[in-house]
Amino acid sequence: MQLPANLAPISVEQDWQHTTAYPPLGFTPFAEGALGNGDTFGLYWPIGREAAEPIVVETWHDEWRVQPHFSSLAAFLSAYATAEDEYVATPSLADDPASPRAAYLEARELIAQRKPDAAIALLEAALAIVPEYTDALTLLHVQYVRAGRIDEAARVAIQAIISPPSFGGPPFKALQWLRTQPVPDGEPDPIWRACGQLSFNFGGSKENADYPVLLAAIDTYLEQGNYLSASTLMQTYAELMSAETVSFQERYAFAPAAFIARQIAVSAQLPNGSRDTSTLWLPDLA
């Protein structure tokens, strides 16, 4: 994983260990800008972009959400230096032209102004930085459908379905739409093949048939050597299952520590290496 060029201005929590589903694997908090109520800023390496410098995200602890505010540590530090009362607000595109969150918010405004092409360009730019940005994926999916870009809409719908709830959603419209599309002959993607078995209604029941489908899809991605999709869906599965009761988890043989250990091991198969940020601070790597 590629560290920022200059870490000196921030106080990184170097003993951070990924032991729970949230915040997601690939995140490490730092002290600057923290509000003291569990919400904090941190470095985050998007899935598949471990060879690039991290972005800076803000965790919204009560909501189990992660907001990809800043495209780089440098962009965050610029905002932090001028923040009133040390509260670092969401940047605008003028402040940080590559901010995924700013691009998403501006895209919503452009859609309201009936400027879909400009909105699509911004959403695509945001997803080039954070491929698992669920909010941006669900919004882009709708725009692709309206534009008649059906093949692209299908791929974005699948990505929205497998992307973590901490980055937005739920992707109900994408799932409902995908279920109406004929599955191409020989389609390799397990989510598209099995989307008719998914509801994405979680919590409040003793059983949920979605979980075995998602777990089987993870296994299929791994068999295909598709470690990007497997890692993405593993993060999603961990977050969804961690929101269930302990008795529910036990019924579905979900052992959080074992699953997270497997998730870290799978991430080591990614083209750019493991997403375990604790390895960044080992003596020979620091």
Where does each model-flagged region fall?
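A surface-exposed partner-binding patch
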Residues: 1-48, 84, 95, 100-103, ...
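Compact, glycine/acidic-enriched structural inserts
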Residues: 53-91
